[in-house]
Amino acid sequence: MVGTRDGGGAAMLTLIEKMTENYIAIKVARKTAKAVETAMQGLREECGDMVAQVFKTITVDNGSEFVTFASLSEWETKVYYVHPYSSWARPQNERSNGMYRRYAPKGHSMDSLSDEDVAHAADLICGLPRKKLGHHTPEELFDACLDEIYTA
């Protein structure tokens, strides 16, 4: 997700865990493959050896920033690419990005946001109960899922 129309400056890498709808937003310096790869390596370090259990699949669009995702085979995570101009193929992510735009409107530079600002906005989104989730929050369900994974 980019801030300004020209795509320059900082951008946001966003991920959705499909079962719990947990939203993860990571600020990247630029919308480049290298910046996204660095963010994903940080996420891998955070998850440790259980990364394949936390992220069973990842679906990305065909943007040039995702060309290195094929190298995620070391994660034992399947990577799927959607067809160009098919945002409907990732509805949860698109809806959550729309919610994120309340905190960082289109055209607003992401450069001014700190990592803490980005994480705080994602936490607010994950803290909203969802009817689809039995009025639980994505955060509650994701935490329970992580507890299950890391205690097994």
Give each language-model segment a name:
Residues V60-N62, V67-F69, Y81-A104, D111-D123:
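RNase H-like two-metal-ion nuclease catalytic core shared by retroviral integrases
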Residues M1-T20:
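An active-site-proximal beta-strand-loop segment
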Residues E74-E76:
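Short, structured coil segments at secondary-structure junctions
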Residues T4-G8, A25-M50:
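Active-site beta-loop-alpha junctions of metal-dependent nucleic acid enzymes
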Residues F55-T57:
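Short active-site oxyanion
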Residues K106-A152:
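C-terminal domain-tail junction helix/linker
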Residues E21-I26, Y81, K106:
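Short small-residue beta-strand/loop micro-motif enriched in glycine and branched aliphatics
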Residues E17, K27-V28, T59-N62, H83-P84, ...:
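Active-site proximal loops enriched in glycine and acidic residues that flank catalytic Cys/His/Asp
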